[in-house]
Amino acid sequence: MKLSFTKMQGCANDYIYLDCRASGVPADIAALAQRLSARHFSVGADGIICICAPVTPGADGRMRIFNADGSEAQMCGNGVRCVAEWLYTHGVEKPVLTIDTNSGAKRITRQGAQLWQVEMSAYSTLPADLPAIHMGEGPLVDQPLTVEGKVWKVTCISVGNPHCVTVVEDVDSLKLEAIGPAFEHHANFPERINTEFVQVVDAAHLKMRVWERGSGETWACGTGTCATVAALTELGICPAGQDIHVQLRGGELVIRVLPGRQLLMTGSAVTVYEGVAEV
């Protein structure tokens, strides 16, 4: 069977996009995500994103995300910008789009060619919202976490999906392939966790790497970048109400923390190519 797809990327966080608005999500989507995401052997991607019919009145579409290991994710900040770009270039030419996700409807505003701003949900630092266990019931800000025999200071943030943020001196020297899985599968996070390692350049500029649950190290993570800026705002390192520039392996995202812990994320959404895969 032949499967038409669009390859898109936001800060090199690349996914295979399927138009499922009429057909629905393929029944074998988990296996399909594993097979097509395999780099060097297939299309290669961080996963598959299905563009579906909306479920909320007035919404323009729905996004469902399947990681490279076949698991379904709640939200992807880079992915939702690409869904907006895909809809915009496929007949939904509106400056503001609303897209349903597994963590609620997101409002996305076009800022220019291949540039979109996402109004993210309010973040939380409470363990019940991650979830996290064995870490108390209060805000998880600047808390000790023992991973592979080393004590790390972490701040845990939910932005619709769970993140663990830790500040390091030199992000480039980290061996994420060794430490990332230990964070992801830590016993304190029963549903696994995404982990961000961040180096502070100054109060408005950060450098970050991310280990995503279900995908491993990726070149960017929109929700992870939001969680990182939220965490550093909680720590008093970054100011609220100002644009914070975060450099990832795949490019730059700009995040702003608004009153009420709301977040704005601005970044690119680029179509790489369209293709057909034999499945």
What kind of region is each of these model predictions?
Residues 116-120:
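Intrinsically disordered, low-complexity regions enriched in acidic/Ser/Thr/Pro/Gln residues
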Residues 73, 121, 128-132, 167:
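Flexible, glycine/proline-enriched loop segments at strand-loop-helix junctions
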Residues 124-153:
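Active-site glycine-rich loop that binds ribose-phosphate moieties when present
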